[in-house]
Amino acid sequence: MLFRSQKPTPKIPERAPDKICDIATLPQAALIYRLSGDYNPLHSEPAYAARAGFKQPILHGRATFSVAGHALLKTCCGYDAAKFKSMEGRFSSPVYPGETIRTEMWIDGAMVTFRATVPARGVTVLNNGMAEIIQ
């Protein structure tokens, strides 16, 4: 069972982001991600994805989340995993394999508010994100 957190949802600041990081996904990323044990045909079978209303198979949510995490780790932690305490966010749109995910970050001390977008389609794919970084 999944329960939503009682914490207030972080809001994206109304100013330009402090940092931006673009990371491209591989066209075959959804097929590779099946190694995690998620065999949902939504991520691998075009006909199944079309019946679900998508133009093609979509990337796993965990993969989208991990790309945003990679951007945070690279940009805010200098790839020092010991500085990366936690992250959370809300999925808001699918990502298609091969798309570039842009993570925009607003830094306030140890707290980083972020969102991830796919600029080519003009959509936000992960919104109201919050990460805690150890200074």
Region roles according to the model:
Residues 1-2:
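Short, small-residue-biased leader/transition segments that mark boundaries at the very start
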Residues 5-16:
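N-terminal leader/targeting segments
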Residues 5-7, 24, 40-41, 77-78, ...:
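Short secondary-structure boundary micro-motifs
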Residues 14-75, 79:
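Hot-dog-fold acyl-thioester-processing enzymes
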Residues 20-23, 86, 128-132:
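Well-ordered beta-strand positions in beta-sheet-rich domains
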Residues 29, 45, 53, 85, ...:
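A residue-level detector for conformationally permissive "hinge/kink" positions
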Residues 64-111:
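Hydrophobic beta-strand-centered segment that forms part of the acyl-chain substrate-binding groove
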Residues 93, 100-135:
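Charged, cofactor-coupling segments
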